[in-house]
């Protein structure tokens, strides 16, 4: 085998590889011998089929397999002999092959860059520190109390307001006909809840208990009863009673409704999700700050092919968002401006990914099988009843498994860097933390 470097441009390399006819023939004969031992043909005992017969019947497929093996083996040998760390699979282009002759092909590769991470201990980061504010817990408790409200008569002399419950007999049309499915007495209708035909409840706002109202409405064109679709209808309605929702008191009794020993325990339970969101936001802010500083401090060349792949993924998602009307400000930008912007983002992501990978490699940071198993279980739980299929999918799909492993590895490397860096704390309010203008942006 003869290997010659024909081109070197940045991280790109191209090699010409020539495999001798003798080497090809050895692979062909080896494959024919394997078939001779296993193939079964009429008129021959197992393992006794002459090689000439095997070649006559299977020669074409055997040669194709031999050439494929020769290219795979020689390309692997070429990379190993030169100690090349490639970013992506080589691009192979067969230049020339005639039966019985040498095999000549070119191999194009992109190399991983040599990366020298900066001094991690010199990184200075600021970590926002926030606690759950009492007002947020109070608001949540108020919502819980409202959800456990009870109805009580309106005792004061006043007209019906939105949110009140007007007790009426089933609405009767001016013709004396009751509505289908609404026959009955003492029907509680919450005003403003849009339980009935649009406009009906609004015309009862302002009525008092004992008052009679004539209500005019137009039924929607898609109303389920054919006779009423799009019909202009007049109803005669008697408001028999007004009731109001009275929220439960925020006390130990309310806590016990939720299985808590006391109001203090309920406050802790209500505050827990808020604290979880604060932790997530703090982690996001610190990680974004860290990645920004790493990006500023490192400017090595990145493999163009990796940038192309990353950009294509970003661009496909953007096209879907543009079609769905969820692209926000991007919807009004020219295509070339968007491509320039997102190619820059793709290059940044690739550079940061390579940098984090190198830091992890140098410090022997590994993703354990237990961590992968936990991630698999979490993913499977997203598909109740299909857990077995999820596990089988990841078992058969190495790329999907790598996509599951990659964020775990990244988080472990980020945690390692944070342990090395100088991290100061800055107290902020929970409201300020949550108002981060880039809160929905991805960390990378």
UniProtKB/Swiss-Prot annotation:
Keyword hit for Nucleotidyltransferase: no
Keywords attached to this entry: Cell cycle, Cell division, Chaperone, Cytoplasm, Isomerase, Rotamase
Pfam families with a match to the protein in the record: FKBP_C, Trigger_C, Trigger_N
Stretches assigned to the PPIase FKBP-type domain: 163-248
Single biological process term from Gene Ontology: cell division
Enzyme class: isomerase
Reactions catalysed: [protein]-peptidylproline (omega=180) = [protein]-peptidylproline (omega=0)
Function statement: Involved in protein export. Acts as a chaperone by maintaining the newly synthesized protein in an open conformation. Functions as a peptidyl-prolyl cis-trans isomerase.
Descriptive protein name: Trigger factor
